From Swiss-Prot:
It catalyses: guanosine(1207) in 16S rRNA + S-adenosyl-L-methionine = N(2)-methylguanosine(1207) in 16S rRNA + S-adenosyl-L-homocysteine + H(+). GO terms for cellular component: cytoplasm. InterPro entries: DNA_methylase_N6_adenine_CS (IPR002052), Mtase_sm_N (IPR013675), rRNA_ssu_MeTfrase_C (IPR023543), RsmC/RlmG (IPR046977), SAM-dependent_MTases_sf (IPR029063), Small_mtfrase_dom (IPR007848). The keyword Transmembrane does not apply. Monomer. Its EC number is 2.1.1.172. It comes from Haemophilus influenzae (strain PittEE). This is Ribosomal RNA small subunit methyltransferase C. Belongs to the methyltransferase superfamily. RsmC family. HAMAP family: 16SrRNA_methyltr_C. The keyword Transmembrane does not apply. It is an enzyme of class 2 (transferase). GO terms for molecular function: 16S rRNA (guanine(1207)-N(2))-methyltransferase activity; nucleic acid binding.
Amino acid sequence: MISLESQVLERHLSFFDGKSVLFAGGISDNFPQTLASKCPSIQIWSCHFDYARTQSAVNFSVEFQGQADLIVYYWTKNKQEVNFQLLQLLAQAPIGQEILIIGENRCGVRSVEKTLAPYGEIAKIDSARRCGLYHFSLQNKPHFELKNFWKTYQHSTLENLTIYSLPGVFSAAELDTGTELLLSTIDNKIKGKVLDLGCGAGVIGSMIKKRVPNAQITMTDIHAMALESARKTLSENQLQGKVYASDVFSDIEGKFDLIISNPPFHDGIDTAYRAVTELITQAKWHLNQYGELRIVANAFLPYPELLRQHFNDYQVLAQTGKFKVYSVKN
């Protein structure tokens, strides 16, 4: 089944006839493959590993190099990520580049007119399925350099660590209160192999490595910008660790003494429990004997019942009015 956005694009198949096409942004289906007979070449650029790993020939990366007759961009709720990717695409495209931008109204696609107005002509050409479709023609190329998009921050809790982050990464500009509470439970009793799952900019794994130098740190995420941020946070703070893409446990190698996470529960603009459900239900298969799963979550979320089902019991290591840190042992 194709997405609402792709259903709207199906109403405009003449745009694709005989053209090389680049799909980018928040694409989540196999619509590009259905165009194989119409288009001499199709490229897909995604920064989301949960999509990239399920499709063939997807370029999963922070930066993309390549051109096409037509670019199709799927708008997402993450405005910083959208701007970052669109500026990249415009900077390397030729004058006159044709771009279709499609997105759900609730994700803010209407703001594309203001976003792209400085760079060319944009017009809305369709409205259906609660989506808007826009046609853009490039007239004024922007300048793009990755180094200009890095943000950094420090925090008293982080003991002189500097956190590096790219656009679209969770808590990119400051330490969030949930992670801060989770960090308050980290002490020198932690040892062995540690997995920071859903690592974002690498705050948790880097902090553990700083406090417990002998810990073996692995950090994973589904977001290309998060992985690049975590690598830079480690390297700029002279810390060592593995960083790679995994959709929860899809690509996890080996077992761990501690799996620690501030797991996401927002998917775009919807609340989604898939990732944290997989984390809790599958963690025991990735923990060593007596290994621990430790997560922070909003206090209202129904995780205690899930933890009991799969680990018999749990402890609350720290809590505030909004967050709780849960711990279970294998």
